[in-house]
């Protein structure tokens, strides 16, 4: 790669709007949690095969097992707090001013005496971690498509009790997991409960299914943002509808490629969305499993999709505008983006999205600062092969893989 003058993307002020709870873990924290609980799950996850091969070769069930292994170490109040703190710390180091992490507290309720306790612990730590790391962290409560729609209503009512825009508040209500499961229409009442409490909807849609599914999500759930929504690029009419409605799309390039939605980074249709006028917020989805942090998504946009620093700055502005932060905070962060762009760029070779730097202890530091095990590194797919899907198509058994939220 030729020498170019580039600004440091870790210093670019931004908001992180698509981040799942257990998937936000880094390897050192995962190891620490395993040691606390006297478990060996971390070594299974790190030393065995699941993280050493691309997700497109693992398949859905193997990927589900990988996520479940990580989730099995989050079995105490101490662990819940550690996950939140690590997410805030890692995002702050990557320039995030506002992180909106999503969680299904149902997964952790058995370990802390109930659903209310699980959510209160997470919210309390989100407020503490915000102050500790100089970042705002809001919480999205996400229902699962794999659970009964009545469970989603329970979560919506619980969310209403803790609604609030500031750090430690429930700032959004989501719906995630396997898009092929569940009837979107049946989750509509839960989203109505949330809206009546002033909580905006942020459901997943259009990660593996096409424009028709995204349109159904819009019709039935009335979202303010859509998690993924990447296949909207295939329908100019749908894209216009999204733009006219002011819906922000949470796009996760590394996740899309790792799961076989697109064969390589250059095929992610980010430019199509931007050229149509869509509001886009880049997110990492599950850094633990995709070995790719928030800043890495901006590097992918720069190094593989050719976005300039001015365009990257506008992406950061979109993420801030798409957040549920107070307007005064947004104005301050937007001014910081302007200052980043006005500063003189650094000279030297730009780091590719997959660049890594060896560090002691058998770990490597990605450009974003995320520490991952050396043997767990996954190079960006893109060399084709039987395991790669055609653009816009999912591999047969690669489905939405965020069960733990």
Annotated model-derived regions:
Residues 382-385, 399:
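Intrinsically disordered, low-complexity Ser/Thr/Pro-rich tracts
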